[in-house]
A protein has these predicted regions:
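Short helix-capping/linker segments at secondary-structure and domain boundaries
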Residues: 214-220
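Short glycine/serine/proline-enriched coil/turn segments at secondary-structure junctions
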Residues: 59, 107, 154-157
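Acidic, metal-coordinating catalytic segment for phosphate/diphosphate chemistry
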Residues: 48-89, 94
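Unchanged
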Residues: 77, 88-89, 94, 119-205
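Conserved Nudix-box catalytic region and its N-terminal flanking loop in Nudix hydrolases
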Residues: 2, 21-23, 29-34, 40, ...
Length: 220
């Protein structure tokens, strides 16, 4: 993948520290970002070192492991973790309305409204995944994808993280949902989506991130 370009025209593999190029919102101050980078460097007073790993289960989507870790105070600890390739979601906005997928989430036991999204294939560039899922679930095609953020939803036990993009230059096509995928596509005002999030009706993190990014860029 080194040297290849993604849909943003940017080299792949720069997930950590991406700054929302492709026409994104203004970045924070250089001094502020340097301070945050310093805070995120490994600190021997806090780091847990993996000294053993046990395979529990390998599934189609994720892998479960138990880890033995050496703690900073010299004792050992036990962690249960889930390894996952991660995913990508895309916020598509047209005339102040954002495209959402309406579907049933059996793990939550409820209906859900979410931006189009899907799992990364091994080694896949997130922008490529975002383009694929947008086309499959909604039929929409975008001229470019602007990186917004990478969100780790359950950082305490899994490495799963979702890259969120804004789609620009939309055109309509034909949806091609995966076999066994039953969804409706709806367009809702961006600010209504945020109101629904505050009311606890929309709980999906990547969707909330996408809506906030749309407001930040005056797309709502």
């Amino acid at each position: 993948m080194d040297g290849e370009k993604n849909e943003c025209g940017r080299e792949q593999g720069a997930r950590e520290g991406e700054t929302g190029v492709c026409g994104g919102a203004a970045a924070g101050s250089p001094d502020g970002l340097d301070r945050i980078r310093e805070l995120l460097r490994d600190d021997t007073r806090l780091v847990e070192r993996v000294v053993g790993e046990t395979r529990v289960w390998d599934g189609k989507i994720f892998r479960v492991r138990t880890l033995d870790v050496a703690l900073p105070d010299g004792t050992t600890g036990y962690r249960e973790v889930v390894w996952h390739n991660g995913g990508a979601g895309v916020c598509a906005v047209r005339d102040g309305r954002m495209c959402l997928v309406r579907q049933y989430r059996v793990a939550m036991g409820r209906m859900s409204l979410e931006i189009p999204a899907g799992k990364l294939d091994a080694g896949e560039d997130p922008a490529h995944c975002a383009a694929r899922e947008l086309a499959e679930e909604t039929g929409l095609v975008a001229e470019r994808f602007e990186f917004v953020a990478r969100s780790a939803g359950s950082i305490g036990f899994t490495n799963e993280a979702t890259s969120v993009f804004l789609a620009h230059g939309l055109s309509a096509g034909t949806a091609r949902p995966d076999s066994g995928e039953f969804v409706d596509v709806v367009w809702l005002p961006v600010r209504d989506v945020l109101s629904a999030a505050r009311a606890g009706l929309i709980q999906d993190g990547k969707t909330i991130i996408g809506a906030l990014a749309a407001v930040e860029r005056d797309l709502a």
